[in-house]
């Protein structure tokens, strides 16, 4: 079974971590069998599964339900579950209560969004036995504050993002996830922190990659993001597509040049 120690050893050995979102047991079992290292029960289910316009309406009850479903299907992969909007920002104690519910539902780690200002919460959780994945850069729960889904950390804002990563690393984060960040900055962050980094639209030099399942299978309606690749193209089955994703992440051929953002 993949653990936080496994991920740390993978970073040290230069072995890339393959992560995908999963929301129910059958896909969790398929991905697990195909060699996916980490399954993310993401609040992206609000858009990918529930048909909402953002992740904000997703509830803790929703997250616990889908975490339970994924936990029934996965045998080897690590399960990371998102703390949903409004379930952890008010206080460290609120965050712990919500995280405890997700862990009881079958999560092995929880993910929270935010920079330096959330590092204290990261420390509070990890000191109480809950591993934390800190999501920085483009954080979808703050999409309305950002004014849309935009690349983060460009130009003069690069140092602030690096500070975010270091703050969470110092606080004991098990993983730092970067979304929509210039590739060179993501590389610098990865080299600057002791914990593994996972990228989505953050270049090939992160310690691992993640995509939303619906995106990598080409079944998400509407325009796809620059960092997305449809792995179903040329494949005969969903399992073959997932295996292709894992293989390309491990071989460092995904993401390619067309999937990354420059400064």
From Swiss-Prot:
EC number: 2.1.2.11
Main location: cytoplasm
Superkingdom, natural source: Bacteria
Reactions catalysed according to its record: 3-methyl-2-oxobutanoate + (6R)-5,10-methylene-5,6,7,8-tetrahydrofolate + H2O = 2-dehydropantoate + (6S)-5,6,7,8-tetrahydrofolate
Residues that hold 3-methyl-2-oxobutanoate according to the record: 43-44, 82, 111
Keyword Cytoplasm belongs to the record: yes
Keywords: Cytoplasm, Magnesium, Metal-binding, Pantothenate biosynthesis, Transferase
Cofactor note: Binds 1 Mg(2+) ion per subunit.
Keyword Nuclease included in the entry's annotation: no
The protein's required cofactors: Mg(2+)
Top-rank EC class of the record's enzyme: transferase
Entry GO MF terms: 3-methyl-2-oxobutanoate hydroxymethyltransferase activity; magnesium ion binding
UniProt: Mg(2+) binding residues: 43, 82, 113
Family: Belongs to the PanB family.
Subunit field text: Homodecamer; pentamer of dimers.
Protein name per Swiss-Prot or TrEMBL: 3-methyl-2-oxobutanoate hydroxymethyltransferase
Organism: Neisseria meningitidis serogroup A / serotype 4A (strain DSM 15465 / Z2491)
Classification lineage: Bacteria, Pseudomonadati, Pseudomonadota, Betaproteobacteria, Neisseriales
Gene: panB
